Regions:
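A short, surface-exposed alpha-helical micro-motif characterized by mixed small hydrophobic
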Residues: 83-85
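ABC ATPase nucleotide-binding domains
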Residues: 114-146
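Conserved ABC ATPase "signature" region
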Residues: 1-13
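Catalytic Walker B motif of ABC-type/P-loop ATPase nucleotide-binding domains
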Residues: 42-45
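H-loop/switch region of ABC-family ATPase nucleotide-binding domains
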Residues: 77-78
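Conserved beta-strand-loop-alpha-helix hinge in the C-terminal portion
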Residues: 97-121
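Conserved ABC ATPase signature
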Residues: 17-21, 25
Length: 146
């Protein structure tokens, strides 16, 4: 329990009533509870629903820690920005089947409709830049700072 508490940074929440926790804090506690069973695969359905930017960043850090421990995380989400920043692979379900699957850069970079805001803004300048961080890095490398 102590290891998971530290991993998810929830020690300050342990003495609080669940009804007094924010949505993001409840989500972290739910992940902690699941982690007690030592899963090899974690299935998350819309994990960022109702999250603010700070909570999404916290969840992103948690997912990276889980990945570093060898845990596979499968996420179903409509949060394209979150998927582009955190996924190793992205897929599109339609009529019960995966009709497209690729790395985030290939998936979102080559897509006109299902893409990120950064991808839409930069598509005619940088090929396959789908996150803000990628656009900033490409601007720095190309000298396009304006």
């Amino acid at each position: 329990i102590e290891e998971i508490t530290e991993l998810l940074d929830i020690a300050p929440l342990l003495s609080r009533h669940p009804f007094d926790l924010s949505g993001g804090e409840q989500q972290k506690c739910a992940i902690a509870k699941i982690m007690l069973s030592e899963p090899r695969i974690l299935l998350l359905d819309e994990p960022t629903k109702g999250f603010d930017a700070h909570s999404k960043q916290n969840l992103s850090e948690i997912l990276k820690k889980l990945k570093a421990r060898g845990i596979t995380v499968v996420t179903v989400t409509h949060d394209i920005e979150f998927a582009a920043e955190n996924a190793d692979r992205c897929g599109l379900f339609f009529d019960g089947e995966i009709i497209s699957s690729a790395t985030p850069n290939e998936f979102f970079g080559g897509n006109s409709f299902y893409t990120t805001a950064a991808g839409r803004i930069s598509r005619f300048v940088f090929k396959n830049a789908v996150t803000v961080e990628q656009v900033v890095e490409m601007c720095k490398r190309s000298g396009k700072n304006d």
